[in-house]
């Protein structure tokens, strides 16, 4: 039977992970084994469970217990299920987007890029992308369009932050990912060196005098290719572009010279992931 706990006070400590803790507090960088993340909606929670993530607690409207969330509850063992009236839960930021169900999961132990990429042919590498919506959208495209892994540099948004998980529709649990380096100083020098040591050629998505079209045959012929994508505003750092094996552009019309990084990633993954 589900371990149901009734909540009658919005300030109850059981709601802290869902209502009051910041992303950094949830992540618990100093004690990563205590870190958690929040997944929202039955579909996203199911994908986390499918991927083997450990549920810590759930929060849902009462009507969900015998409704759409009933199957999820059978998979969560004795994790406490906090429940309350919709009127109380409506005070949670973004609750309307959750379909009435949230779940706190234990963060997994970090994995190394080398471990993830042993058999990978195509990987996405994200540099300094801090917008969680873009990170989530990139993961969704990576899952749909044949990327074997996603690597992020230390200045990127956490892929397990709440909005990134939501926008990815749970695909962040399906695509293996790892952080490439411990501090911003490890990128691009050490990060690109590690990619080369793993056998990858690197393709910087950027406009420059030496950019080749994304359908260039040499790119398709590479046995292992890392597609490097930059921050929303300024794009990739000049040092990153200069250090990559290729600089790649997407041919465009009507005088447009760039796309949002999430849109550009989808085009790049479709063309280069085939």
PLM feature segments, named:
Residues 203-254:
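Active-site/ligand-binding-proximal alpha/beta "capping" segment
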Residues 103, 141-145, 159-173, 238-274:
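Structured adenosyl-cofactor binding patch, chiefly the S-adenosyl-L-methionine
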Residues 1-68, 156-157:
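Boundary-proximal intrinsically disordered activation/regulatory segments immediately upstream
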Residues 4-11, 80-85, 176-187, 248:
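Short acidic-hydrophobic, aromatic-tinged amphipathic segments that line or gate anion-handling sites
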Residues 75-94:
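A glycine-rich helix N-cap at a beta->alpha junction
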Residues 67-78, 240:
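Short, aromatic/basic amphipathic alpha-helical patches
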Residues 5, 108-210:
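RNA substrate-binding interface of SAM-dependent RNA methyltransferases
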């Amino acid at each position: 039977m589900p371990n149901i706990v009734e909540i009658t006070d919005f300030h109850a400590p059981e709601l802290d992970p869902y209502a009051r803790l910041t992303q950094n507090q949830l992540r618990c960088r100093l004690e990563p084994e205590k870190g958690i993340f929040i997944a929202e909606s039955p579909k996203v929670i199911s994908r986390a469970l499918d991927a083997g993530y450990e549920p810590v607690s759930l929060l849902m409207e009462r009507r969900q217990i015998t409704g759409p969330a009933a199957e999820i509850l059978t998979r969560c063992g004795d994790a406490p299920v906090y429940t309350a009236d919709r009127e109380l839960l409506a005070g949670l930021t973004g609750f309307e987007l959750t379909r009435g169900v949230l779940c706190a999961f234990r963060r997994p132990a970090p994995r190394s890029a080398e471990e993830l990429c042993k058999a990978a042919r195509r990987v996405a590498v994200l540099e300094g992308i801090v917008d969680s919506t873009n990170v989530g959208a990139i993961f969704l495209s990576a899952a749909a369009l044949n990327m074997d892994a996603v690597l992020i540099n230390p200045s990127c948004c956490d892929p397990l932050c709440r909005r990134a998980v939501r926008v990815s529709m749970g695909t962040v649990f399906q695509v293996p990912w790892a952080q490439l380096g411990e501090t911003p100083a490890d990128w691009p020098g050490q990060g690109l060196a590690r990619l080369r040591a793993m056998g990858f050629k690197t393709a910087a998505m950027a406009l420059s005098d030496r950019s080749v079209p994304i359908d260039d045959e040499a790119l398709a012929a590479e046995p292992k290719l890392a597609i490097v994508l930059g921050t929303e505003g300024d794009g990739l750092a000049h040092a990153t572009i200069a250090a990559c094996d290729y600089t790649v552009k997407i041919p465009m019309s009507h005088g447009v010279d760039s796309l949002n990084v999430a849109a550009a990633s989808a085009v790049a993954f479709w063309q280069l992931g085939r």
